[in-house]
Amino acid sequence: MKTISIKDIEGIRIGNAQNFTGGTGCTVILSETGMCTGLDVRGGGPASRESELLKPLAAAQSIHAVLLGGGSAFGLDAAGGVMQFLEEKGIGFDVGVTKVPLVCQSDIFDLTVADAHTRPDKAMGYEACKGAYKNNYQDGNFGVGTGATIGKFRGMDYCMKSGIGSYAVQIGELKVGAIVAVNALGDIYDHHSGRIVAGMLNEERSAFADTAKLLYSSYEVHDNKFVGNTTIGAIITNARFDKSQLSKIAGMAHNGYARSIRPVHTSADGDSIYALSVGNIAADCDMVGTLAADVMSEAILSAVKNAESAYGYLAYKDLKFI
């Protein structure tokens, strides 16, 4: 098994667009020929678009783009730009008079980071597609990762800056990768060592406050629980699977969330994972699902380690006590 770039998986294009001043952005994953896709949502507050298409009983067997965006529900407007871009290129489901691109989307909540009135819109979605054709994807404070933060159980005063991350591996001809925007209520753990590497800081910002311990300190209802969270990501593979199998792989990839984010899948998160099939390699579903959890954990680490301090929030690179 060797490590590769997420951009080494053929059949997709990935692009970022962002507004650094406004503190938000979006990241698009495009397939010109269509990609079979599954979805597993574990968080209690998702902001999403066209998720019904991905159910096994839905007629469409492939879609043309997955968009990961900021702006919460407001940011769902960005999919219109993706649709416009793909329609102009003649990509989509042929309905005779035109081709209708099938675009699914999930968004994070980043409205409290910089300018609450700056959100991904149709123009930004279009720019992300242009970026995909320029191969402009990178990890860190870009695309949907622009406004990502973590460790928000006590609100924004003690949280840290996060971003978008990716990780991919190859075994023989099989390629499996993950891309993820880490915007969690909880803290981020290094799944190798079991130690917190980013998350909620104490009042002196000299150590981690440990969200799980704070949560366990009282079983009474936490009225102050911050609701602006969500970790959204995608597994991308060149193996051939149907929607049911891909939904299973997406579900197994959530094990990567559970290893690396604590607490995770709360009512204050909208945690979601897509699984995309963009090839014809024959592979075992359970093997790929197990591998999906591994690459997702690594992608989460990449997201926090590549983040830069911004908007007054410290990043992993700034911490002196780790």
Place the predicted regions along the sequence by residue:
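Alpha/propeptide regions of enzymes that mature by internal proteolysis
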Residues: 1-322
